């Protein structure tokens, strides 16, 4: 668990370094910015919540790859964006993922402005292709997690505990006994 936490903290610094380096910051400034992001108060204070740390690890990669796929209209960065969103969805806190989607929406509007509507109307096919590719890559990678979530959704009860029947169903399955030998 400690190695995983350190891995996520390191990944947040590496992602921020690549993001800052892409915008042609001096390497020392990019290194300083990535160390500041990696060791910011949120990461240090939230180290006990691993999924929050995972969110900070993959957020710079999502922003960098999305920026590059919108500005360069490259299939490679579109696939990277879908995969980065998958990592964020699969590892981070769910609210962080939703906030990131809103952030990407505003980021898209900012990148395609000042003539937002005229730019969207004139290039709508390319933007639609980019976003459909991102969605397809994201869904293909996330499909096991989505199916697992949908299967476990009926078993979740908010505000009340699990009933006795649900708690005792398959309590001593043979596959669970195998964990005793490990």
For the regions a language model picked out, list residue spans one by one.
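Short, intrinsically disordered/low-complexity patches at protein termini
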Residues: 68, 122, 170-171
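Membrane-interfacial, low-structure loops and terminal tails that flank and connect transmembrane helices
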Residues: 114-127
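Periplasmic/ER-lumenal interhelical loops and adjacent helix-loop junctions
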Residues: 127, 135-182
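Membrane-embedded helix bundles of polyisoprenyl
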Residues: 4-6, 10-23, 27-114, 130-149
């Amino acid at each position: 668990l400690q190695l995983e936490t350190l891995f996520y903290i390191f990944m947040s610094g590496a992602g921020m370094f690549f993001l800052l380096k892409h915008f042609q910051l001096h390497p020392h400034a990019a290194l300083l910015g990535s160390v500041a992001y990696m060791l910011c108060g949120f990461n240090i204070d939230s180290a006990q919540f691993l999924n929050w740390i995972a969110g900070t690890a993959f957020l710079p990669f999502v922003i960098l790859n999305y920026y590059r796929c919108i500005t360069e209209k490259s299939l490679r960065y579109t696939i990277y964006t879908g995969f980065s969103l998958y990592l964020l969805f699969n590892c981070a806190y769910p609210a962080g993922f939703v906030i990131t989607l809103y952030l990407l929406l505003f980021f898209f509007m900012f990148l395609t402005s000042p003539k937002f509507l005229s730019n969207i109307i004139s290039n709508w096919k390319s933007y639609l292709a980019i976003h459909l590719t991102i969605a397809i890559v994201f869904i293909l990678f996330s499909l096991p997690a989505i199916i697992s979530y949908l299967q476990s959704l009926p078993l979740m009860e908010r505000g009340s505990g699990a009933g006795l029947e649900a708690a005792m169903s398959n309590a001593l399955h043979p596959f669970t006994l195998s964990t005793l030998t490990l």
